[in-house]
Amino acid sequence: MKFQYKEDHPFEYRKKEGEKIRKKYPDRVPVIVEKAPKARVPDLDKRKYLVPSDLTVGQFYFLIRKRIHLRPEDALFFFVNNTIPPTSATMGQLYEDNHEEDYFLYVAYSDESVYGK
């Protein structure tokens, strides 16, 4: 998926910002969250998050669901590198395994469990 954040900010800027965030907040991880193409869920009001490393993916789902005002019966799926992460993993684990060279973790969200292009 093409992330708008990457389109809006050149790599060097993102890398410098990612490094600065990791130094200043070692117990938190920088995450970019954007809606997947063709997803029929609302847009987020912001896409950059600084998340506690020990927050679980399940807790992060809850946080994002609240921000986009999803009803309990509405489905929501996260994708990290085109894969749905386990809800029991911590955001710190997910970050360590999947962050990009700019020190950001990129998460796409959708109402579909299949990653659309």
Curated annotation (Swiss-Prot):
Annotated GO MF terms: beta-tubulin binding; GABA receptor binding; phosphatidylethanolamine binding; phospholipid binding; Tat protein binding; ubiquitin protein ligase binding
Tissue specificity as recorded in UniProt: Ubiquitous. Expressed at very high levels in the brain, heart, peripheral blood leukocytes, liver, kidney, placenta and skeletal muscle. Expressed at very low levels in thymus and small intestine. In the brain, expression is particularly intense in motoneurons in the embryo and in neurons involved in somatomotor and neuroendocrine functions in the adult, particularly in the substantia nigra pars compacta.
GO terms (BP aspect): autophagosome assembly; autophagosome maturation; cellular response to nitrogen starvation; glycophagy; mitophagy
Alphabetized CDD domains for the sequence: Ubl_ATG8_GABARAP_like
Lipid attachment locations (Phosphatidylserine amidated glycine): G116
Keywords: Autophagy, Cytoplasm, Cytoplasmic vesicle, Cytoskeleton, Endoplasmic reticulum, Golgi apparatus, Host-virus interaction, Lipoprotein, Membrane, Microtubule
Lipid-conjugated positions (Phosphatidylethanolamine amidated glycine): G116
Effect of R28A: Does not affect interaction with ATG4B
The keyword rRNA-binding is assigned to this record: no
Residues the UniProt record annotates as site (Cleavage): G116, K117
Cross-referenced PANTHER family: MICROTUBULE-ASSOCIATED PROTEINS 1A/1B LIGHT CHAIN 3-RELATED (PTHR10969)
Stated name of the protein: Gamma-aminobutyric acid receptor-associated protein-like 1
Organism, scientific name: Homo sapiens (Human)
